[in-house]
Amino acid sequence: MRVGVLTGGGDCPGLNAVIRAVVRKGIEAHGWEIVGFRSGWRGPLTGDSRPLGLDDVEEILIRGGTILGSSRTNPYKEEGGVEKIRAVLADQGVDALIAIGGEDTLGVAKKLTDDGIGVVGVPKTIDNDLAATDYTFGFDTAVHIATEAIDRLRTTAESHYRAMVVEVMGRHAGWIALHAGLAGGANVILVPERPFSVEQVVEWVERRFEKMYAPIIVVAEGAVPEGGAEVLRTGEKDAFGHVQLGGVGTWLADEIAERTGKESRAVVLGHTQRGGTPTAYDRVLATRFGLHAVDAVADGDFGTMVALRGTDIVRVKLAEATAELKTVPPERYEEAEVFFG
């Protein structure tokens, strides 16, 4: 049996750990040939692939990024995309695919399964916003990176007695902002799920200044002010219809400075949250996902995604996995509010 594996969407720490697990178990437990498709769904569209043997994955566990490359290619936006993939798989003798990605990559996997192509999904997103799994790998590393940045920024903020606004990733879900903000002792946390009042933020900030402390504000890139809209870096859309967010941190820092008369700075963590070595937790979770994805392929259980429920790895239908996003519930945000101001 020949099994293909690909990584789609934004990169994140832990992708190589999944690939390593798929190759090791696929070859050693089943005697399969493993084919790595390059650049996400672009690989199966164009036939761009490489064989993956045990030596190819020997040293990749601790590496960030993905040895296969990634892209935001959407085969359903390509003329004859499905038939091109079907032809490539037939030409290369690939019997099944393991697709590692977030909502967009898994959405394509679900459609391909409906079109008769055998696909098993592995959830990947630093945003942790897939509802069918308790956690996705990459999230823990992103929170760790953001928390460390907050710790470092606090000392410079205190030295200059200024407000520091830290913008983190999170288009629709504020899990990184919530977890990193709590772990870093932020004085204000702003998430996409809760439109914020600029007046309230300023009140919290001034309360900190009155106590001679430098306030730390953590804001997700998708957070919006009441009655406002998302701040866009560019209006251009990718193949899945997403615009590029960014800039709410700078906008808010300017508002704070203007309304308080105090110095305020914005720091956008950006792609540092996606890079570098995965945490131990993400390495283990990604490895377990890869092992169980191989089991799903061996069982012919296509149209499913491996997921974490409690401490167990289970399988869920791709239709369930892509039906909705997991956003921060009101009660979780309210837990953090006791620390605001």
Curated annotation (Swiss-Prot):
Report whether Transferase shows up as a keyword of the record: yes
Q: Where is this site: Important for catalytic activity?
A: 124
Q: What induces it?
A: Present when grown on glucose.
Query: Which reactions are catalysed by this chain?
Result: beta-D-fructose 6-phosphate + diphosphate = beta-D-fructose 1,6-bisphosphate + phosphate + H(+)
Site note Important for catalytic activity and substrate specificity, residues: 104
Q: Which cofactor does it need?
A: Mg(2+)
Q: Name the residues that span the membrane.
A: none
Q: List the disulfide bonds.
A: none
* Thermal behavior of activity: Optimum temperature is 35-46 degrees Celsius.
Q: Which Pfam families match?
A: PFK (PF00365)
The entry's substrate-binding residues are 125-127, 162, 169-171, 221, 265, 271-274
Question: Chief subcellular site?
Answer: cytoplasm
Active site positions, chain numbering: 127
Keyword Magnesium (UniProt): yes
GO CC, sorted alphabetically, is:
6-phosphofructokinase complex
Activity regulation info: Non-allosteric.
Q: What does this protein do?
A: Catalyzes the phosphorylation of D-fructose 6-phosphate, the first committing step of glycolysis. Uses inorganic phosphate (PPi) as phosphoryl donor instead of ATP like common ATP-dependent phosphofructokinases (ATP-PFKs), which renders the reaction reversible, and can thus function both in glycolysis and gluconeogenesis. Consistently, PPi-PFK can replace the enzymes of both the forward (ATP-PFK) and reverse (fructose-bisphosphatase (FBPase)) reactions.
What family does the Swiss-Prot or TrEMBL record give for this protein? Answer: Belongs to the phosphofructokinase type A (PFKA) family. Mixed-substrate PFK group III subfamily.
Q: How does it assemble?
A: Homotetramer.
Its protein name is: Pyrophosphate--fructose 6-phosphate 1-phosphotransferase
Organism equals Amycolatopsis methanolica
